[in-house]
A protein has these predicted regions:
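Tandem CBS (Cystathionine beta-synthase) repeat/Bateman regulatory domains
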Residues: 1-147
Length: 147
């Protein structure tokens, strides 16, 4: 495929979700408290955490937005469990999925973090809009230096 970029044409290979995702994923049990989930997110410098059931199956995701929503509605408490706050209707990506397709999902569903899962639905990593933006900045920087 040839893509016009700044009056030039550049050939590229599609970038896959697995190329840019953060891994291993940061996870928490659905029985953990939201306080524990938030601390784990902070300690790992991530904006989301995947929620697993006792069998290690991905059952949800908690994002910074979820925690801010809960805090602003005075829902946070020492006993609030991850399962009570997590988003359950997950939008996921496969490791071989083109990043452009993942970006479309992010736009369509108004989300910033997508779990990347294998064929059995086990989490492999997380692809965030920040991961994609960082890649875009590096790519643009390379392009500018080459001109």
């Amino acid at each position: 495929m040839v893509v016009p970029v700044f009056k030039r044409s550049v050939r590229y290979s599609p970038v896959k979700a697995s190329d840019l995702m953060s891994y291993p994923p940061v996870v928490v049990s659905e029985d953990a408290t939201v306080e524990e989930a938030a601390k784990t997110m902070w300690d790992n410098g991530v904006g989301s955490i995947l929620v697993l059931d006792k069998d290690g199956t991905l059952v949800g995701i908690i994002t910074e937005r979820d925690i801010l929503y809960a805090a602003s509605h005075l829902l946070l408490g020492k006993d609030l469990k991850a399962r009570s706050l997590m988003s359950k209707n997950l939008v996921t990506a496969s490791p071989d999925e083109d990043v452009a397709s993942v970006l479309e999902k992010m736009k369509d569903f108004n989300i910033r973090h997508i779990p990347v899962v294998d064929q059995e639905g086990k989490p492999l990593g997380v692809l965030s809009s920040r991961d994609i933006l960082d890649f875009g900045v590096k790519l643009l920087s390379l392009f500018i230096r080459s001109t």
